[in-house]
């Protein structure tokens, strides 16, 4: 019998090989993975009916069996009618098929994708295997420079380190207001799922603990499917398709994990008019920071990837920073190197803060000086951040001007932190 690892590797290879074939026909990887998602959901629904006698969630006449028996233009027509109908449904199905459209209009290639999916039994496959296959496809999609999908994909080793530091606990609510393909939520779920054997707590974790928002329908589809394959949100997706910044948070949460989009708001976005915001600005990441500060419960914790300018920008940036330091404990800043994100040249940090107490001191971990990562030759791995996570948990300085000037971990009283110096020395990590 094949091991999980063998199954994962062979299936991933099969999926990638077909992606290469379709790319030769002008079908991009993003379009491919989207169609794969739509079809895989139909197949798993059919397996649920066949193996467990469950009632199909798909309306009669639009199920997997109605698709696999067809060829040629009849297949394309049936598929497109199915997508249209399912995009109008409620709950999980409506989310998975949000604004769904067929991007494989040549029947022979659509049939190839359907046949590949039909060869496997997906529902009984180990959830970790299904999830790992899908995650690997999402990562490959993130590498596709033409699609720009990298902006929705945060390196998983960084996510895992952030989650290990924040340490979400089962029973807590976790939100990512710019969730992309769901990496933070999924990693938080994996961290919490073994913490309790209580059915009540595990049901809460699967169905109510996680909350994600993204304003791109395609990304909402991918995130919802990613979580579904891991057993999360099987009735209703925890992902909502909307603009987080347009309205005040309806509920407060215990934990926020996020990497909000950098730069300005996309063309056509609604202007931000939030009376609850501390200051009005067109800076996207500053608005996300305000939104997240307002979303946290008292005592709530956040780990957020933000660009360098958030640390030193004047005007609105200074106003928000003062609020952050007064009403929150901004206790840790992880300075990141370039070369770890699919969007090249990004200078970023992870800000860790807790709501309810003012900041007295800030710990800085310099993972920028003399650190070089590239996606090709020295890709970031989780072990690269082991020292940071250990320092985060132990709070013992490793920097010593005389004995260990290369130490990366040191603290400053908040009044000693010079944001002007940070701006003047962007390549330096320490103040």
What are these regions (language model features)?
Residues 20, 36, 178, 189, ...:
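Residues within alpha-helical segments
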Residues 122, 201-203, 295:
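Surface-exposed acidic, glycine-flexible loop patches that form ligand/cofactor-binding
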């Amino acid at each position: 019998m094949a091991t999980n690892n063998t199954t994962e590797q062979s299936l991933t290879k099969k999926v990638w090989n077909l992606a290469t074939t379709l790319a030769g026909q002008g079908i991009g990887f993003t379009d491919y993975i989207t169609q794969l998602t739509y079809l895989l959901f139909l197949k798993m629904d059919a397996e649920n009916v066949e193996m467990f006698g469950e009632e199909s969630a798909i309306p009669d006449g639009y199920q997997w069996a109605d698709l696999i028996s067809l060829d040629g233009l009849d297949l394309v027509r049936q598929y497109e009618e199915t997508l249209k109908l399912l995009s109008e449904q409620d709950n999980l199905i409506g989310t998975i098929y949000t604004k769904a459209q067929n991007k494989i209009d040549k029947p022979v290639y659509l049939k190839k994708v359907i046949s590949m999916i039909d060869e496997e039994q997906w529902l009984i496959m180990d959830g970790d295997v299904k999830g790992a296959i899908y995650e690997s496809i999402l990562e490959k999609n993130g590498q596709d420079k033409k699609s720009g999908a990298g902006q929705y994909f945060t390196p998983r080793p960084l996510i895992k380190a952030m989650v290990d530091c924040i340490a979400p606990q089962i029973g807590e609510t976790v939100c990512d207001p710019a969730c992309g393909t769901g990496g933070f939520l999924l990693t938080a779920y994996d961290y919490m799922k073994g913490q309790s054997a209580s059915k009540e707590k595990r049901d809460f974790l699967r169905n109510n603990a996680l909350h994600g928002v993204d304003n791109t329908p395609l990304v909402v589809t991918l995130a919802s499917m990613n979580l579904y394959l891991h057993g999360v949100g099987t009735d209703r997706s925890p992902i909502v398709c909307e603009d987080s910044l347009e309205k005040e948070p309806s509920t407060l949460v215990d934990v926020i994990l996020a990497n909000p989009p950098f730069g300005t708001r996309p063309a056509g976005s609604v202007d931000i008019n939030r009376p609850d915001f501390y200051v009005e600005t067109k800076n996207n990441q500053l608005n996300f920071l305000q939104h997240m500060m307002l979303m946290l419960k008292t005592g709530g914790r956040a780990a957020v990837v933000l660009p360098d300018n958030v640390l030193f920008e004047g005007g609105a940036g200074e106003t928000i920073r003062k609020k952050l330091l007064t009403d929150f404990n901004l206790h840790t800043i992880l300075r990141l190197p370039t070369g770890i994100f699919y969007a090249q040249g990004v200078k970023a940090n992870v800000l860790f803060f807790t709501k309810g107490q003012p900041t007295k001191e800030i710990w800085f971990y310099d993972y920028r000086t003399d650190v070089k990562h590239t996606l090709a030759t020295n890709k970031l791995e989780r072990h690269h951040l082991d020292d940071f996570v250990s320092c985060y948990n132990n709070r013992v300085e490793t920097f010593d001007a005389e004995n260990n000037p290369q130490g990366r971990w040191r603290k400053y009283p908040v009044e000693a932190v010079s944001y002007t110096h940070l701006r003047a020395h962007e390549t330096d990590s320490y103040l």
